[in-house]
From Swiss-Prot:
Keywords: ATP-binding, DNA replication, DNA-binding, Helicase, Hydrolase, Isomerase, Nucleotide-binding. It catalyses: Couples ATP hydrolysis with the unwinding of duplex DNA by translocating in the 3'-5' direction; ATP + H2O = ADP + phosphate + H(+). Its EC number is 5.6.2.4. ATP binds at residues 22-29, 275. This is ATP-dependent DNA helicase Rep. GO terms for biological process: DNA replication; recombinational repair. GO terms for cellular component: cytosol. Gene3D superfamilies: 1.10.10.160, P-loop containing nucleotide triphosphate hydrolases (3.40.50.300), PCRA, domain 4 (1.10.486.10). Rep helicase is a single-stranded DNA-dependent ATPase involved in DNA replication; it can initiate unwinding at a nick in the DNA. It binds to the single-stranded DNA and acts in a progressive fashion along the DNA in the 3' to 5' direction. Residues 1-277 form the UvrD-like helicase ATP-binding domain. It comes from Buchnera aphidicola subsp. Baizongia pistaciae (strain Bp). Residues 278-562 form the UvrD-like helicase C-terminal domain.
Amino acid sequence: MLFNEHQKKAISYISGPCLILAGAGSGKTRVIINKIVHLIKICHFDPKCITAITFTNKAACEMKSRILNVLSVNVSNLVKISTFHALGLEIIKSEIELLNIKSNFTIFDEQDQISILQEIVSKEDRSFVRQIRQSISNWKNKLLCPNQVNKISNSSIEFKFFRYYELYNAYLKSSNILDFDDLIFLPTILLRDNKLSRERWNDKIKYLLVDEYQDTNFIQYKLIKLLSSKRSNFTLVGDDDQSIYSWRGANIHNFESLKHDYPNLRTIIMQHNYRSSGRILKVANALISNNLHFFNKKLFSNLDYGSIVEIISAKNEEDEARVILQTLMLHKSNYNAQYKDYAILYRSNYQVKIFEKFLIKFKIPYKILANISFFSRPEIKDLIAYLRLIINPDDNAAFLRVVNRPLRGIGAVTLQKLKEWSKKRNQSFFMASLDIGLESILPVHNLKSLQEFVYLIQTISYQIQLNPIEVLEKLVATIKYEKWLMRSLKFSKLYVASIKNISIVLNWIINELKYKIMNSKKFVMKYLIDIISEFILQNSLNEDIVINNDYVQLMTLHASKGLEFLYVFIVGVEEGVLPYYRNTTMENNIDEERRLAYVGITRAQKKLFLSYAIQRCQYGVVINTKPSRFLRELPQSDILWQKSKILNLNEKNNFLFKAYKKSLKKKLLR
């Protein structure tokens, strides 16, 4: 296997802290895989003492698959490849007694957080609740507990938010629930404050690799330091020019902190790009050179210099969508390309609607990569909430989610009285439903409905420990969920899709459980807890982009990171869109918008098109726009400015007919 000099250095250096500054398309995943192989085969590291951290489950699965191609199954399975949250969950389970958490805890996602904060805040609008959730998340990611926030609160609104943080934390504790932030917050606090735990995990992880270092936030960097505090044996791989997630807490200054905290840091810069033409890289380098840099880096390629970069000016967003798609069809016809070779990238999701209209009109097959997770679908959230409640009866959020799904005639007044009673008795909603005193405040039929639901959950919880697979296979029928969906959705496409989705998840859970209980049924509930936690963490059995099918692919610039396409269109390259209007006042924000444009440009392999509209409708008002400042920063000798051409009806029909005829001829020749 051939490597360039910088890749060789990156793979072989293990004598202390190492930063691999990996430019776009420089083969970073290949380097990480081969560094793991080098650690095992050449340096004789025990595979189970090597941990690699990625940011997504998809990236972790890809890395596992590629390691499997190089190492034997037995060896590759010992290497831990994980996300930060999955590793945090493992630490929590391992150190659960020190953390004073009950073993049947469940995990909250963002939607659950919003629902509970809505209860706590009471009568406040949803956008305000989202602000509170974000503040709590920010505090946890800065390692701040409620009492610490109280000390630094400088305004009445901060103090108010601190109180919500306090109440929210108390709710989590009483319900035996962790949110996503806790999965990193709790292990980091523990490793910081408990020397024995810190040493134990330093001995478990003797070499640490972290991918996408530019996406780390304050607490993740702190966790990296704690996990490697004994030996400083780590390799961090990232690119400061691709740091585009500050809105999610990513801190580009972690590069600066790294240089300061580790004076003996070895920095290896990989600049050789194996993806894009020389001209595309020249354009990308020129753009990003306008940012301040922690490191000097300039991408180069040994591939052809390539065709000119085209900038298309359109009258408005409709004209932009039309001309881009006509250009795409003509280009496809001229170069015998496939639709899957093309990507249309945009800054914000609202931009895609007009493109969808013309894609349908021109009969172009397409796929929009949306950031909607499989887990967020109502039927999946219901199923997981049932399982959470079966595992953990203290989970009040799960109780509220499913107590009336299917409908059981348990109204808002009944639930409010139950909440008040449970608070008075210091019990979960589940246990309060069984309290003998509840009959004094609830009508008989309401109490009966409530207790029948609780008895149903208790029965399933008991039976699942005896015959787990059979109980799970019959779960949807037992809770009468399918009948309820049938009545609600009346055999519509949505009903069919919902039943199919439930079946996918249940089959996945059943298969995982079958594998775990092959040797013993003794720990069924523990296994189920692990499986549900894993599913919630994955949060993405959603459809990924389908590379093998012949679709034009549309996605945001953020979603395009890590992907590559032969031909790329970046649309809406104008002031207020890219850069985004909210990010045009502060230099740091402009730098990130520029990095976002850079990420889009470096997705292209052979040909790049950029477009902007002279007028755009925003919030119902047509406004005049200006081409993005980023276009002026590109090397003008390498770009061609084009005006959109409005075809008359005959030209349009002739154009579409020629493209269709050529496409049909190609299909017949296959």
